[in-house]
Amino acid sequence: MALAVPQTAVPRLPRGVRLRRDEARGGWVLLAPERILQPDPVAVEILTRVDGRASLAEIVDSLVAAFSAERARIDADVRSFLDNLAEKGFVEFDR
């Protein structure tokens, strides 16, 4: 179920959730109480921009500039990814 998140919403990692580099696992991990995810490189590009200050629109714009990709496509992918993480409690939105 997709969330109706406005472009001005600011995604953030909730208390107790953090993204960190894990050399033992050979990549990045998203840690939460009693849960762990190993994000792929595309997910890491998104998650490193989720800093609790940048809006959804700013994150999308940053990715468009970094990858010279179509904004509509990146917007849809970022929304889908963050909606999925929000449903699982790994991301929250300040509106």
What are these regions (language model features)?
Residues 1-44, 48, 94-95:
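Acidic, low-complexity/disordered tracts enriched in E/D and polar residues
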Residues 35-95:
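Long, charge-rich, low-complexity alpha-helical segments
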